[in-house]
A protein has these predicted regions:
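N-terminal beta-strand motif that seeds the catalytic metal site of vicinal oxygen chelate
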Residues: 1-15, 67-71, 119-120
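Short glycine-enriched loop/turn motifs at secondary-structure junctions
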Residues: 1-2, 61-66, 96-97
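Core segments of cupin and vicinal oxygen chelate
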Residues: 7-48
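Short amphipathic alpha-helices within nucleic acid-binding modules
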Residues: 19, 77-82
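Vicinal oxygen chelate
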Residues: 31, 42, 80-120
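Short hydrophobic/aromatic beta-strand element in the GNAT-like acyltransferase core
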Residues: 40, 50, 70, 102-104
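Short, charged/polar surface micro-motifs in flexible loops or helix N-caps
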Residues: 46-50, 60, 75-78
Length: 120
């Protein structure tokens, strides 16, 4: 079994696409509108995992506690500098634990994003 994507329902599609491209480093794999009130963008990493951004006009929840997505980065210091340059609030870390270092930000939809640099 292979986890192929996660879906985030959003009312901020354009802002979300920019976040996942510029901060996380994903690239748009495909984008389409299956119906007049629905737009979908899939953003992909270099290993094939995708984030599906779904805008369908329905209300989104502000209660996203307990949900987070983790993304491995090459350099935590460089990623932290990028995040700060974009005025994105860091709400946890940077923290060093055995095997890795990480910090947390929120995407435009309030989803917690953990950015991780594994020790090599």
């Amino acid at each position: 079994m292979n986890c192929c994507w996660c879906t985030i329902t959003t009312n901020k599609l354009e802002e979300s696409v920019v976040f996942y491209e510029e901060v996380i480093g994903l690239s748009v794999a495909r984008r389409f509108s299956p119906s007049p009130d629905t737009e979908i963008a899939f953003l992909k990493d270099n290993r094939g995992f995708e984030v599906e951004l779904l805008k369908n006009g329905r209300p989104t929840s502000d209660d996203l506690n307990g949900i987070s997505l983790g993304f491995e980065v090459e350099s935590l210091a460089d990623t932290l500098a990028l995040v700060k340059s974009k005025n994105i609030f860091v709400f946890g870390g940077p923290t060093k634990v055995p095997g890795c270092s990480f910090f947390f930000v929120k995407d435009p939809n309030g989803v917690s994003i953990q950015l991780i640099e594994n020790d090599h």
